């Protein structure tokens, strides 16, 4: 009987750490917005909320997306940053839902991803406050984060974006190194 309860406890605790996955195979999170994927409208809404538009490109079965959703995004500081600072729109690398780019071009997700030359998932695209009407998302991006990174790189990038570090003189890599030094993580 003890073994049965132990097994049930293990199953419940291990499944609690797993991120939810939708019918399309993409991870679900309460900080991902359901929109019409018109990036101009999403950007305007993000700005109205005082947030940065973050476009995250993912795909079914992506082990690096899973790593981010299960190990990195749930970290309290990162989860708080996602809720407080970002308006997140998810794009399916192989999806068929129409996406309208900043220049007015409308394509299915998979074709828009190809237009952006996005090869890897996850891919996070962070938009600045001002985006030209003739721009593409990747052409106007304040920063692009391809792939899965650990806690400190992700947190420091989120913070650098939130303080609009991309508008200043300190590139992200120097900011990141300084933050690691100030936290006593590296010398």
List each language-model region with its residue ranges:
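A short beta-strand-turn-helix
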Residues: 34-53, 82
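Short active-site neighborhood of thiol/selenol oxidoreductases, capturing the structured segment around
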Residues: 49-63, 88
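Thiol-based oxidoreductase modules, predominantly thioredoxin-like and allied folds used
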Residues: 31-35, 75-107
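Conserved redox-active cysteine motifs that mediate thiol-disulfide chemistry
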Residues: 59-73
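Non-catalytic, surface beta->alpha helical segment in thiol-disulfide oxidoreductase systems
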Residues: 114-169
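N-terminal signal peptide c-region/cleavage motif recognized by signal peptidases
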Residues: 13-14
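Sec-dependent signal peptide recognition
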Residues: 1-7
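N-proximal helix/coil linker or "cap" segments that precede and/or mark the start of modular domains
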Residues: 19-32, 167
């Amino acid at each position: 009987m003890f073994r049965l309860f132990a097994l049930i406890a293990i199953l419940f605790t291990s499944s609690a750490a797993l991120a939810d996955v939708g019918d399309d195979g993409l991870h679900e999170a309460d900080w991902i917005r359901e929109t019409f994927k018109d990036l101009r409208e999403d950007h305007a809404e993000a700005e109205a909320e005082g947030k940065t538009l973050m476009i995250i490109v993912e795909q079914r079965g992506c082990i690096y997306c899973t790593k981010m959703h299960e190990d990195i995004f749930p970290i309290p500081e990162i989860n708080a940053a996602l809720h407080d600072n970002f308006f997140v729109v998810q794009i399916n690398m192989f999806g068929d839902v129409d996406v309208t780019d900043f220049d007015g071009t409308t394509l299915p997700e998979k074709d828009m991803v190809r237009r952006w030359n996005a090869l890897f998932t996850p891919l996070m695209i962070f938009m600045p406050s001002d985006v030209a009407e003739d721009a593409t998302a990747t052409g106007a991006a304040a920063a692009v984060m391809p792939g899965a990174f650990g806690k400190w790189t992700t947190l420091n990038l989120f913070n650098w974006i939130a303080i609009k570090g991309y508008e200043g003189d300190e590139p992200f890599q120097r900011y990141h190194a300084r933050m690691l030094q100030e936290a006593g993580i590296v010398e």
